[in-house]
Amino acid sequence: FETKSPVDGAVLASVARGDAEDIDRAATAASLAFKSWRDMPATMRKKLLLRVADAIEDNADDIAVLECIDTGQAHRFMAKAAIRAAENFRFFADKCTEARDGLNTPSEEHWNISTRVPIGPVGVITPWNTPFMLSTWKIAPALAAGCTVVHKPAEWSPVTADLLAKLVKQAGVPDGVLNTVHGFGEEAGRALTEHPVIKAIGFVG
């Protein structure tokens, strides 16, 4: 499908219209990558997510300009949002080593123990406004926790989702850990929320 800029109505890109089959392929990839990502030492996951943050910072101006053209929002807002996206990855990278910290809260009558484990492949569905930053708001904590992700960005502003996926790959994050499927909510989005491999869904907006 074509995505158009709200600034002047110009066609920005031709975008793959993902469907249930594409979601299934992405979910399968996320499932296959889950065990090794889950079992990767937290310090290594932290290092990779910090590399993603660095890559976002290095490309912040390009991200901001693309966001402006794709969403129609002002550069002064999108420039700050791009930096915030890097900060999101840094914040959650620092949480990698705490991701499985449980609690031991004994009382006189009970001994209460909580544990944390990565739930598995998760879906992330993000909105059209400030799409890059809001995507990192859900993707970064999921990756830090040891989950793998299938991301379905809003069809109204899909351009920077591809850039995020490329930066994540360039940073050295293994294949299958982050998977992006474009498409419409009633097709790709619905298939994602109903897929049996996907253990949880994160919505933003």
How does the language model describe each region?
Residues 101-205:
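Rossmann-like NAD(P) dinucleotide-binding subdomain of oxidoreductase/dehydrogenase enzymes
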Residues 4, 40, 145:
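Single, functionally critical "micro-switch" positions that shape active/binding sites
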Residues 1, 22-25, 55, 114, ...:
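A generic short alpha-helical patch detector that favors 3-5-residue windows
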Residues 2, 14, 66, 77, ...:
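Conserved beta-strand positions that form and line the central face of beta-propeller blades
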Residues 2-5, 11-25, 172-177, 181:
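Histidine- and aromatic-rich ligand-binding microenvironments
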Residues 10-99, 109:
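Glycine-rich loop-to-alpha-helix module at the N-terminal edge of alpha/beta enzyme cores
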Residues 1-15, 47-51, 99-125:
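Terminal low-complexity tails and localization/encapsulation signals of metabolic enzymes
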